[in-house]
Amino acid sequence: MHSILRSSLSSREALRMRQLKGLRKERPGRHPLGVRLRAIWTSFLFPNPPHSGGKLRASTAAVEEHQEWSMDLPEGQAGGPTAQMYLWEQPEEASSRPLLSLEEQILNSTFEACDPHKTGTVTVAHLLAYLEAVTGQGPQDVRLQTLARSLDPYGEGAGATVELDTFLVVMRDWIAACQLQGGLERAEETAYEGALASPHLPSVCPEAEESANLESFGGEDPRPEGPATAELLSNLEDLELSNRRLAGENAKLQRSVETAEEGSARLGEEITALRKQLRSTQQALQVAKALDEELEDLKTLAKSLEEQNRSLMAQARHTEKEQQHLAAEVETLQEENEKLLAERDGVKRRSEELATEKDALKRQLCECERLICQREAVLSERTRHAESLARTLEEYRTTTQELRQEISNLEEQLSQSQEGPEELLEGAEAGRVGWIMALPPSLDLEIQAIRQEQDVASAGLSSPLYGVWQWEEVEPEPEPEPEPEPEPEPQEVEFPSEDPARQQTDLQREPVRALEGSRAPCLRLSRSQEEEEEEEESWVLADPSSPLGTYHHKLAPGSSRESCHIVPEMHQALMPVVRDLVPVERSRTQHCLHPQHSPGIRISQHPLVPTPVLGLLLLLLLSILLFSQSPPPTWPHLQLYYLQPPPV
């Protein structure tokens, strides 16, 4: 609809421009500028209607042109006061808006013509150029200059722009000012025509009317003022004829206007029907567009649903495969579950068995603890007894020292025995009897009783430790008796002594023949001494740092001290648990309980020494050996070990 309006406006503007050009060609000598301005400002930009009751005071061409342009108006509005309320055909979208007047429609059309790109702004220079082209005025026109100042109040020049709202407001004010100025000019023209008109003539001179009209539009009359009355009368008849002719033409024009009004009414009805049809068509088009959009949406939805269906089908196939795989896994898991249940039953049975074994082991452990407590009591008793024996040993050592001192005295006496052997023999016999009486009579018996008690205690006490080797005693091997020496040569006999560095001097430097009676006690003494040494060496090596479950090795008679450092083998039946009941510091090395052997006292028998002296000396040496014997091995530093339960 906008394009139709723009095309109709442009066609009408072109028609008017052609009519203006025709007027210029028809009346070149009758002020074409004034006629053209009056026609344009009246019909296009300034639709000022003529006053009611007034007469048409324009030339014939101007009247015809004005009537021709008035045919565009609806019926009853051509040249009337309702011309400015003429309504152009509005688009369907603008039917709800208030109806625009002819002035607003013309202004909108002018702005749209200057703004073909629909930017909403137009330069002032472009608008002025368009108005100059339409009106035919130049930039020197006062009214156009006033309009330019109104559109460009800040004097920006060629870069000034104006919007539609500003353009409409400024143009309305400018048109009102031009209409006011035009009304004053028409009042002056009417007064001038009344002065020239004759009361007997129906009309005045057409030249005077034309001059007045031209003056009202700013034109000038070049003819000389005050023509002769004769000439006026001669032209009066011509004017009357032309008036009649114009009246006939006016009647024809009235009939054509009526016909045009009827046609306009029919066209209005057709336009209304077309508008209704256009409205229904637009509604149907909108419905069709909506349906088309819905159809496109449905197509898109259908495509998406198809894609979802395909994806769901693929997912269903994949899910079915997974279900089959899961079913196989479930069967496998069921089989494994059955196996695990069987294993669980076996484990339960094994747990019950282990619980039974655990209870038995607990009972054994309690029994072992009870036995260990008893053994600890026995060991403490033995430790106290060992301490008492150690004190007794110290007393014996003191006595041994005294005896050594006495022996040294005897050696001195023996050195002097050459002078008085008889007296020496008697003194030695008396000293022997006194020494024997001084010795404790039950020393040997006490030692034997102590050994027997230890053997009975070790045999009577049941050991709580499983797989423990018992203490062993090595029986002394009998040694062959030494053969008696046939020759009475001086013999050297070694006797044990406390001090290894001390060397005894010979008792007699002269050889003395030994008698058979005196040789036999010496042999018995040497044999008993060897047996005692073997017994002492046969004691088991005790390692305080080793547990009670280890194997103990006996010390052979001919073995050295290094042989006692033998690594014991652990019994594999039970694992010992360490519990130190006696807080005793243990050394990291193994220790051997070996008998303390005192170095022997070398005595050289002189053949001149009498037999009683030798017997006395042998008796003294025997007593020294008895006193210097080491006590049997005890367990003062024995550590106790509990047993761990066997591994499952």
UniProtKB/Swiss-Prot annotation:
It holds the Pfam family KASH_CCD. It is a single-pass type IV membrane protein. One of its GO terms (cellular component) is meiotic spindle pole. This is Protein KASH5. Its main location: nucleus. The C-terminal 22 AA is required and sufficient for localization to telomeres at the nuclear envelope. The gene is Kash5. Residues 206-228, 473-545 are annotated as: Disordered. It is found in: Nucleus outer membrane; Nucleus; Chromosome, Telomere; Nucleus envelope. It comes from Mus musculus. InterPro entries: KASH5, KASH5_coiled-coil, KASH5_EF-hand-like_dom.
